[in-house]
């Protein structure tokens, strides 16, 4: 039997009132146990849904009441089957949408129910009444609404700069994929990244959501929609500002800088090596090929020749080292000449002495002893002269014996000295430069008391002969010895 137009208008008015009150306060729903018996009072089925303060049904005429009673007693239309799954999905979308959408839905639809169908009346043997959806469905709607309200209030004090946990992000991506399975190809695979790059993960997952659905309309449990939107905006701003700045701290830039600095240090420490050339005779490579070629020549044809033995050498240093070997021969030659001259003079003295003192044996013994001592002194003097005349030898400028010998050989250099010479060495002549310098540092420079041998090069001191102070022994040796102090040989 068809429902009359007056009954339909009454139902629409009641449902519109309940719809308008639902946005302000939670809906008041009675359980089936509290509902009156429909068989005892047919009109009671509608009265428990109507607010007595509204003059909606109180102003209706008696004809409307009779029409309503006759309609309730009529057989109900065939039941329409609806699925609670479609109801739940529609209810979730309607509740989590914006208030503007709720208002438009309340004004455009005839009945503000979670599903677009009218309440399903159930038939019975005696009478029929309207059965609303289960109370558990409305409880879910109320829970979602309270969660959205609490999320908006808590978002004022939320810290949006904190990183999003990876577990929540994976759950969020799973929910996005579950709610929109047709757009799974738009998601990008998020690879693990360092902790400093976690800010770029959330915008990648949220930007792929279709623009028809906002983030707040997606059912993400435990993640307030407003917080997701604000975090998305903040992450987008941070990513755009980071992309605008030059990446001066990128691993590539740091690696390039470190390699460039290390190459500069290596080039500063290592000098440029000379290019080696191949010898045409032995086919070996040498940096100084011209010097090496002289080694293939015979000793007579080499450029540096010894003036004594006429032996040739490829390098001048080899010639200097070779000349020192001739010092012994030169010393013996000089000593032989000096001894011959002195022996001739001694022979003349001996003949005069023997002719004058033939009668006294004691005097002969004394003359023999004196002659032996004089010969020893003369021998040493001749040896010193022979060493003194060797060219290239290093002579101590403070040796008293060598200074007196030089003044004797060159009388015009005899003068008073402004320093006190000492007998520091037996001869005062050295064949090697390092030995000569070690002699000067050890015997002619005064160090502070208790100075260790390894500290002599850094401690200050003074000259033993003139008393001048110097910061270290090297300054004294290079700027004072032989220039400001000491004897200059001929």
Curated annotation (Swiss-Prot):
The Gene Ontology CC terms held by the record are: cytoplasm; mitochondrion; nucleus
The stretches annotated as zinc fingers (C2H2-type) lie at 304-326
Matching entries from PROSITE patterns are given as: ZINC_FINGER_C2H2_1, ZINC_FINGER_C2H2_2
- Region Disordered, residue ranges: 1-85, 231-273, 338-375
Query: InterPro entries given for it?
Result: Znf_C2H2_sf, Znf_C2H2_type
Can you provide one Gene Ontology molecular function annotated for this UniProt record?
sequence-specific DNA binding
* Record bears the keyword Transmembrane helix: no
Q: Which residues carry this modification: Phosphoserine?
A: 153, 155
Q: Has the keyword Zinc-finger been applied to this entry?
A: yes
Q: Where in the cell is it found?
A: Cytoplasm; Mitochondrion; Nucleus
Major place of residence = cytoplasm
Cystine pairings recorded for this chain: none
Q: What is this protein called?
A: Zinc finger protein STP4
Originating species: Saccharomyces cerevisiae (strain ATCC 204508 / S288c) (Baker's yeast)
């Amino acid at each position: 039997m068809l429902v009359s137009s007056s009954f339909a208008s009454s139902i629409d008015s009641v449902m519109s009132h309940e719809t308008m009150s639902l946005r302000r306060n939670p809906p008041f729903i009675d359980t089936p146990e509290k509902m009156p018996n429909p068989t005892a009072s047919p009109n009671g089925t509608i009265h428990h849904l109507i607010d007595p303060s509204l003059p909606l049904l109180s102003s209706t005429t008696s004809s409307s009441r009779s029409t309503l009673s006759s309609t309730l007693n009529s057989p109900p239309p065939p039941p329409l089957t609806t699925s609670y799954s479609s109801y739940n999905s529609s209810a979730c979308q309607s509740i989590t949408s914006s208030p503007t959408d709720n208002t438009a839905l309340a004004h455009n639809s005839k009945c503000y129910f979670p599903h677009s169908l009218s309440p399903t009346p159930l038939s019975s043997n005696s009478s029929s009444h309207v059965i609303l959806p289960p109370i558990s469905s409305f409880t879910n709607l109320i829970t979602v609404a309270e969660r959205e309200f609490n999320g908006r209030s808590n978002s004022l004090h939320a810290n949006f700069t904190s990183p999003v946990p990876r577990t929540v992000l994976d759950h969020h991506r799973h929910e996005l994929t579950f709610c929109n399975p047709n757009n799974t190809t738009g998601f990008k695979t998020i690879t693990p990244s360092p902790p400093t790059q976690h800010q770029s993960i959330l915008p990648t997952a949220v930007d792929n959501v279709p623009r028809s659905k906002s983030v707040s309309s997606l059912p993400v449990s435990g993640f307030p929609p407003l917080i997701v939107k604000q975090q998305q905006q903040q992450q987008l701003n941070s990513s755009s500002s980071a992309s605008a700045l030059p990446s001066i701290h990128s691993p590539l830039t740091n690696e390039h800088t470190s390699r460039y600095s290390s190459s500069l240090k290596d080039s500063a420490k290592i000098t440029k090596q000379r290019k080696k050339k191949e010898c045409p005779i032995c086919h070996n490579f040498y940096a100084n090929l011209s010097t090496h070629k002289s080694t293939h020549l015979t000793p007579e044809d080499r450029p540096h020749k010894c003036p004594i033995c006429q032996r040739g050498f490829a390098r001048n240093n080899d010639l200097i080292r070779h000349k020192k070997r001739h010092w012994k021969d030169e010393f013996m030659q000089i000593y032989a000449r000096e001894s011959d001259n002195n022996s001739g003079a001694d022979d003349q003295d001996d003949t005069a002495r023997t002719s004058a003192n033939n009668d006294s044996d004691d005097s002969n013994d004394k003359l023999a002893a004196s002659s032996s001592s004089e010969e020893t002194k003369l021998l040493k003097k001749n040896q010193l002269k022979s060493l003194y005349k060797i060219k290239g030898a290093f002579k101590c400028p403070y040796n008293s014996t060598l200074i007196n010998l030089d003044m004797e050989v060159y009388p015009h250099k005899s003068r008073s000295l402004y320093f006190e010479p000492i007998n520091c060495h037996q001869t005062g002549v050295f064949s090697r430069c390092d030995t000569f310098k070690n002699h000067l540092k050890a015997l002619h420079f005064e160090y502070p008391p208790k100075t260790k041998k390894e500290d002599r090069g850094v401690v200050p001191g003074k000259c033993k002969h003139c008393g001048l102070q110097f910061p270290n022994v090297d300054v004294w040796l290079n700027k004072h010895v032989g220039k400001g102090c000491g004897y200059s040989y001929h």
